[in-house]
Amino acid sequence: MLRTRLSVSVAARSQLTRSLTASRTAPLRRWPIQQSRLYSSNTRSHKATTTRENTFQKPYSDEEVTKTPVGSRARKIFEAPHPHATRLTVEGAIECPLESFQLLNSPLFNKGSAFTQEEREAFNLEALLPPQVNTLDEQLERSYKQLCYLKTPLAKNDFMTSLRVQNKVLYFALIRRHIKELVPIIYTPTEGDAIAAYSHRFRKPEGVFLDITEPDSIECRLATYGGDKDVDYIVVSDSEGILGIGDQGIGGVRIAISKLALMTLCGGIHPGRVLPVCLDVGTNNKKLARDELYMGNKFSRIRGKQYDDFLEKFIKAVKKVYPSAVLHFEDFGVKNARRLLEKYRYELPSFNDDIQGTGAVVMASLIAALKHTNRDLKDTRVLIYGAGSAGLGIADQIVNHMVTHGVDKEEARKKIFLMDRRGLILQSYEANSTPAQHVYAKSDAEWAGINTRSLHDVVENVKPTCLVGCSTQAGAFTQDVVEEMHKHNPRPIIFPLSNPTRLHEAVPADLMKWTNNNALVATGSPFPPVDGYRISENNNCYSFPGIGLGAVLSRATTITDKMISAAVDQLAELSPLREGDSRPGLLPGLDTITNTSARLATAVILQALEEGTARIEQEQVPGGAPGETVKVPRDFDECLQWVKAQMWEPVYRPMIKVQHDPSVHTNQL
C-alpha cells in the first residue's frame, strides 16, 4: 500500500473495516495497526516495539509482523493485496510511545475522559482520570455547554484555542458539529481581534518563530518540528497585512494557525502534519512597539536586501527540510505578496491565499451569478474598489479564467477597472502604481472630464456587471452608488469583502433594499439572511483547502493557473442557485464544506496530471512489485473516492502502546 505524507496509517479503509468486523470480541488495544510518521525522522526507521507489560501482551508473533513503508511494525492481516492498494488512508489504530501526564498533555494523542478502561491500564492513566469513560458525543455535549456559557466572541475564541492545544480530535469534532456558528469564532471575523491581542492573551506557543536577526538558525528551527517527510502543508506569514487590520507583528502566527485549522477542518489534512510559521521581521505598528507585553521584535520592519536574503534562506530551508511540503503565503504586505509568489511559485509548490485563494472564490461566485442570470463572462465588466493584494488577485483570477476559456489576455484586462485611494487607476499614475496594477490602467484621454476619484461617477461611466469591495473603507458602497449601478444592471452583482465586518463597504440588508432584492450579494464575513435570501460568504475556506489538498495528494511541483481555474469551475458548479430563484445563495453551505473541498481537490489533481505537474504516479507502491507505481483514477467520481479515503476525520481511534528509539526524532508529541 502507498505510503502517504498526509496519512498516519497504513491500513486501507475497507481492510480495517473487514478486520474489525471479523474480530469484534477482541479488545481494541489488541489491533496493532500502525499510525506512523508522528515520530519518524529523515531516512531512519522508527524502531517501534510492542511492550511486554502484563497490561498489554503482544498478540502476535514476529512472523506475523511486517515492516510498513515508514519502518514501523504492523500486523499482516490479509493474505492477498487489496485491490485498492494505491489508496491512502487515515484509519487504523494509533501507536503511542507516551503515557501518564505526557499522554494527557499531547493534543494529538489525548482523549481525555474518552480513554477506554483498557487504554487507561496500558498507559498508566487510571489515577489521573475520573472513573467514568465518556464517548466523543458526551465530550462534545459538555464542551458545547461550556462554550455557550461564554458571552463574547473573543472569549469563545479563547475557549476554542485552549481546546485545540489540549485535544485536537475534540476541537475539530466540535467545530464540525457547529460549523456555521464556530467558523466565525476560529477564523474571520473574531480571529482578527485575537491576533491584535496576541501578546496580552498568550498562553501556550504554537508553531515556529523565525527571527530576521538570526537568519542562520532558520534551518535548525524548522527541523525541530520534524523529519523530511513529516510535514505536508506550511502556512507562513510576516504579519504585515493581517485580515484588513494591517501590521500585527508576532501576533500574525495566529493567522497561520487559523488557516491550518481550516486546512484540517475543510481539507482533511492531518493536524499533526501541518506547520505554522511566523517570520518576525519587526513591526511598524507603534502601539505594539510601545507595549511592554509585546512578545516580538520591537524595531521597525526590516525591508530591502536584508528582508529578501532572509526570505531566500527561508525558502531554501523549506526545500531542504520539508522537500515535499506545499508552502502557503499568508497576509504579506502588498509590496511583497505578489513579488514573492512570482519569485518562488516555480521553485516549490506554493500558493498565496490573499491573491489566488480570494480570486478563486470570488471568481466562482461571479460565474455562478452570471450563469443564474444568463450572462456571459466575456461580456462582463468588473469594477474592483481596492487595488491591494486581494483586489489584484481577484482581477488576475478573472483575467486568467477568461484566458483559460479562450479570451485574449489584453481584451480580458480591458474588462477590469481598478480603484484605489487616488481613484480609478490611470496610465498617468504609472510612477505611483505597481507593475501589477498598471496592466489594468486606463487611458487618461478616455476619462478626461470625469471625476475618477468619485466611485459614483466611475460606476456611472463603467456600468459594471459586478462591483467588488476590497478597500477596508466602511460604507463606501453608498445608496447613490448602488442605485446608479442598478440603473444599468437589473441584477447587480455586488461583493463587499473587506474584513473584519465593521469594515465592509456595505451591509447586505442595505444592498437588497436599494435594489428591491435584485442584487446578487456575497460578503467577506457571515451575515444573516435578508428577506429569505441567503447571503453567501466569499470565504477563502471555500477555495484554499481544496486547492491545497489537491496539491498535497498530487505531489504537485507547482500550483498552476489552470489548476486553480479547475478548482474555480468545480466550485461554481456546486452553487445551489436554481433557475429563477436566487434565495439559496451563490455558494454551497458551510455544512457541506468537506465534500466541497474534496471535489475541488479532485479537479486540481486531475488537472495536475493532465499538465504533467503531478509527481504522485512516479512514487513506488510500498509493498508492491518492483517498478509498480501509484495509479490515480482518471474518472472524476473514482478519483473523488480516492481523495476522500485520504482525508483525516476527527474521531477517536484505538491506541497501541509502544516503545521507541529515543535517538529518533519525536515529532509533535
Curated annotation (Swiss-Prot):
Composition skew (Polar residues), residue ranges: 33-43
Molecular functions per Gene Ontology: malate dehydrogenase (decarboxylating) (NAD+) activity; malic enzyme activity; metal ion binding; NAD binding; oxaloacetate decarboxylase activity
GO cellular component terms listed in the entry, alphabetical order: mitochondrial matrix; mitochondrion
This enzyme's EC code(s): 1.1.1.38
Keywords of the record: Metal-binding, Mitochondrion, NAD, Oxidoreductase, Transit peptide
Pfam families: malic, Malic_M
PROSITE patterns for this protein: MALIC_ENZYMES
Residues involved in NAD(+) binding: A387, A390
Protein's UniProt name: NAD-dependent malic enzyme, mitochondrial
Species this protein is from: Saccharomyces cerevisiae (strain ATCC 204508 / S288c)
